[in-house]
Amino acid sequence: KNPALIKKHKNNYLELGQSAAKDFLASIKKVLIKDSKIHFDRFTSEDRHIHKKSFTKKALAIFEKSGLMYKKDGALWFKTTQFGDDKDRVFVTKDGFPTYFLADAGHYLETKKRGFDQKINIFGPDHYGYVKRIQAAAEIMGVKNSKIIITQAVRLIKRGQEVKMSKRKGEFVAFGDLVAEVGVDVARFFFLMHSPETHMDFDLELAKERSMKNPVYYVQYAAVRCSGILNKANRKSQIAKRKIDFSLLNTTEDINLMRMLARFSEIVDEAAKNYNPQILVRYSMDLAREFNNFYEKERVI
């Protein structure tokens, strides 16, 4: 709380803050949904869906029944050290305001009430210290299947040099600007090539290059070749499937491509079970490599 701001704006400071947050969220949604073509089933408002529906109060009541709460310096604390945390955490400040920790516990309850038995939390690289308390909240709220993903920083490489950024100084490149420069397909593909839990270098020059060095162009080129074969086959081929001699598919390139294609269902299943689209992206690159090898050494039509 900033006393000077409260005095200046009197009772309007909360409304002003909410209005600014609403505008900021709208700009983020535009980048994510319209510009980046990312679909969200639902957006949750912490104010409307968590606080105003009393999920923080319900979470607090559950914590109080756990016997792991205590008062200190006018604040309400939770014994997160019993869950491996390095220190206990404040739940409610001495001014009576709930902390992010309590709000996150409320999120668990709200998710559980909507019928979900699993919650995946995605944090930035500066939130390692938050893991133990979130795991504690999940356990107390009765959500047994809780996963935490710590994303890593992305370095932007331009002309072989790292573009220096600083959150403290407000120096950064927004994802929307990146999409505008390289295109949405390339931006999405480059990010999905890497696990969110590993560091990533985004090579701006490579992303804009239209050659086989660019993995996006490489995969798209294979797709165009596939389409060309299928189009010609539909126009010219009158051979019935039952008359095809599959024994002719016996070269190294034939066999490698067929083996890769046979893995498709397994790859989709693995990506779904691990919540990891990177597996599909890597597979598309491997499949493109095998297909291009096949295409360059075998006359198809």
Describe each PLM feature range.
Residues 1-301:
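Non-catalytic interaction-recognition regions
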